Curated annotation (Swiss-Prot):
Reactions catalysed, as given in the entry: sulfate(out) + ATP + H2O = sulfate(in) + ADP + phosphate + H(+); thiosulfate(out) + ATP + H2O = thiosulfate(in) + ADP + phosphate + H(+)
Enzyme class: translocase
Binding site for ATP: G35, P36, S37, G38, S39, G40, K41, S42
Keyword Chloroplast: yes
GO-annotated cellular components: chloroplast
Cellular compartment(s): Plastid, Chloroplast
Identification of the protein by name: Sulfate/thiosulfate import ATP-binding protein CysA
Keywords: ATP-binding, Chloroplast, Nucleotide-binding, Plastid, Sulfate transport, Translocase, Transport
Enzyme Commission code: 7.3.2.3
Lineage, opening ranks: Eukaryota, Viridiplantae, Streptophyta, Embryophyta, Anthocerotophyta
InterPro entries according to UniProt: AAA+_ATPase (IPR003593), ABC_SmlMolc_Importer (IPR050093), ABC_transporter-like_ATP-bd (IPR003439), ABC_transporter-like_CS (IPR017871), P-loop_NTPase (IPR027417)
Amino acid sequence: MSILVYEVSKSLGNLKVLDRVSLYVRKVSLVALLGPSGSGKSSLLRIIAGLDSPDYGSVWLHGTDMTNTSTQYRHMAFVFQHYALFKNMTVYENISFGLRLRGFSYQKIRNKVNDLLDCLRISDIVSEYPGKLSGGQKQRVALARSLAIKSDFLLLDEPFGALDGELRRHLSKWLKRYLKDNGITTIMVTHDQKEAISMADEIVVLKQGRFLQQGRSKNLYDEPIDYFVGIFSGSFIEFPQLEESLDAPLGSSSSSSSSTKKSMEKDFTPFIPDLIWSQIFTNQSIHHYHFFLRPHELYLESQIDLKAIPVQIKKIIYKRTFVQLDLSITPSSWNITIPIGYQAFRKLNIQSFVQKLYIKPRNQVYLRAYPKKKNIISKQI
């Protein structure tokens, strides 16, 4: 059962909540909506669910225009941030409510509810009322209630937002497998990029009510359409900028800026083996762009390598699953942060901060270039 949203727009007064948003969700796939608060993600879910009407555009479910069709006929379940549990019903009664309405037998209801209670790790609260539950428990009860009726479509708004740690990772993996096994087409809103990458077949990025890019997580990570999508899908390492005016005539430069440029070209030689990129880096047009790499595209080693750039260790931060190295390339004042696994870190055999490391690009590098915009780096996202 596929979902097609075609040029949907929605305004609240003078505020444009959604601006001609289009997306397609293939049958039995999971699409994650990413974007900052206020980008229109939850509003889009409400329109797809039939809880709100668009000012313009249409919503198609499995090839049928359902834009003006009531929610109850859309064969759709949803879990929003306000869990809407029945306060006077126990956890068991909340989860079984939809099954009882559909006339399932007592034994089938019991088996289904108990299975979901076990999988979502809430068997211990089966007789409790919502008023006594934590936010994370309420979330899981609401999710279990939606999954119990096995709809064709499922809409999730931050389904694990109140959870963290190992439980959240476990439930994310379980839910992805459950949705595939039961043939449910799903759209999920999340602020957790790692969760979106691990769960979703495709990711959609929204900003200020506008569609920016849709694709597989690897495509968005490797080749984001702009800086915003790039930084939203993972960490960037920016190439340093030359100290030279953007308004300077082509070919004109001071002796100091010329020496800086030569130093920069020398430092970046390993990164620009391609002829086209070489021309960009030696051309005035470099001043009009920001250039970025992903941290994983860089390789660190402790042995002297004439084809690599020497770097100074500034700081070592030990995280739960990786080590963060803050490094500096002195001639060009290029400060970079590289996360590496503990096994790779041990191989570097770092003895002191005085020790130099050597960095170079891996075999395949996507050198991303985006036009400069005022305050593009410092802008809060």
